[in-house]
Regions:
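N-terminal Rossmann-like dinucleotide-binding module
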Residues: 1-51
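Rossmann-fold dehydrogenase core element
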Residues: 2, 113-130, 150-157
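Beta-loop-alpha module in the N-terminal Rossmann-like domain of NAD(P)-dependent dehydrogenases
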Residues: 16, 56-117
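Glycine- and charged-residue-rich phosphate/anionic-cofactor binding loop of Rossmann-like
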Residues: 27-31, 310-327
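Hydrophobic residues in well-ordered beta-strands that form the structural core
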Residues: 100, 125-127, 237, 263
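C-terminal capping/lid region of NAD(P)-dependent oxidoreductase domains
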Residues: 123, 150-154, 337-365
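Predominantly a Rossmann-like dinucleotide-binding segment in NAD(P)-dependent oxidoreductases
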Residues: 131-217, 341
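Contiguous beta-strand/loop segments that form the cofactor/metal-binding neighborhood of enzyme cores
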Residues: 186, 192-270, 297, 301-314, ...
């Protein structure tokens, strides 16, 4: 049985609890940490209800005290994004496997340090890009690997959502360069991971334009990224947190010489278009995975199962630290592109952080 702890008991934590409970044959929650004690009580109560047991868990406001009290196999980090690197390194340096909610880190150096530390200590590191496990996404990846879409030309990701002023007021760290970033880093990173996974190619350049139109935050509330791959493929990402009056769409589109696929739904969980040579589109459109109760989707259970299996089989998780690094690198390159007004050559892109994005330096057009 693997002992899990949760660091940070915010709005995503109920999904984390679900993921652990749904893998209860091999995983159990033994501890939590948060600076607000009542949030830890809420997580304990929720976990007890879901496993139908009054089994208590260790609660510490200082996450470092958990290792002094209990044996820990896996730490799940779901704090403000700006703390992911520090906390992740602490657990990895103390022999604990780590799952980090997106993003992996807020700098290229920090993300690389996490990946390197996990490798050095022979530990597993995963990032919660849980939408990779959605059934329609798995079908698309399989079709691409089998070359059923032929040569891939381009991909498009659109995340057209709304995050009103209350969203940012509820947690003042949101939208800050130090702890969060803007809509590209926060809302769009899952689809950025997906499109890069589907393209499965080395990136040549990243170019972006972003703006802050109406939200009272440091970072962008709208952005567009253009990625050119070394093979010639092109991917575009459009992200918005200011769609009126409510979320409009989250879609992933892949086009190739023999196929076009569009996946949408609340959390890229529904096939909207499946026009692939030799396939019956109606059969694919009839696949009903149902809408989840939030944009977090269904993937945490499968992501945690894959992580547990990776530990058992001594292999890399599907969404390992390197995958998390690649997603962060794309977004940070987009931020640097906005700051400089130039496309960023990825092979020459070494060091950058959201902290380099002081608002006064950003050219919002």
């Amino acid at each position: 049985m693997l002992n899990f702890v949760i660091i940070g008991c915010g709005r995503i934590s109920y999904k984390i609890v679900d993921g652990i409970v749904n893998n209860k044959e091999k995983a159990r929650l033994v501890g939590v940490s948060d600076i607000v004690f009542s949030k830890m009580d809420e997580i304990e109560f929720e976990y007890q209800n879901k496993i139908n047991s009054k089994e208590t868990i260790v609660k510490k406001e200082n996450y470092k005290e958990l290792l002094e009290s209990i044996s820990v196999d896996v730490a799940i980090i779901s704090t403000e994004s700006g703390y992911h690197e520090e906390i992740g390194l602490y657990f990895l340096e103390n022999g604990v496997n780590v799952i980090i909610e997106k993003p992996l880190a807020m700098s290229i150096e920090g993300a690389r340090k996490l990946v390197d530390t996990a490798k050095k200590n022979n530990l597993k590191l995963a990032v919660s890009h849980q939408n990779r496990f959605n059934y329609p996404i798995q079908l698309l990846k399989k079709a691409i690997k089998e070359n059923r879409l032929g040569k891939i030309f381009n991909g498009m990701a659109r995340i057209l959502w709304t995050r009103d002023d209350n969203y940012y007021l509820q947690a003042p760290w949101r939208g800050t360069w130090a702890l969060d970033g803007g809509t590209l880093m926060n809302q769009c990173i899952h689809n950025i991971d997906l499109i890069n996974w589907m393209m499965d190619d080395e990136i040549d350049t990243v170019y972006a334009q972003t703006s802050n139109y109406i939200r009272n935050i440091e970072a962008e509330d709208y952005g567009v990224i253009l990625i050119r791959y070394k093979s010639g493929k092109i991917a575009t990402i459009e992200g918005s947190a200011i769609v009126y009056p409510k979320n409009l769409e989250e879609t992933l589109t892949i086009t190739g010489e023999k196929g076009t696929v569009v996946i949408g739904g609340m959390a890229v969980n529904k096939i909207n278009t499946w026009r692939v040579e030799g396939d019956n589109e109606a059969e694919y459109l009839s696949i009903d995975c149902g809408d989840p109760n939030s944009v977090y989707g269904y993937g945490h259970e499968a992501l945690y199962k894959d992580f547990v299996d990776a530990l058992d089989e001594n292999r890399e998780p599907l969404v390992n630290g390197k995958a998390g690094l690649e997603a962060v690198k794309i977004i940070l390159a987009a931020y640097k592109s906005q700051k400089t007004g130039l496309p960023i050559k990825i092979s020459e892109f070494k060091g950058f952080s959201t902290l380099d994005m002081e608002k006064k330096d950003v050219k919002y057009l």
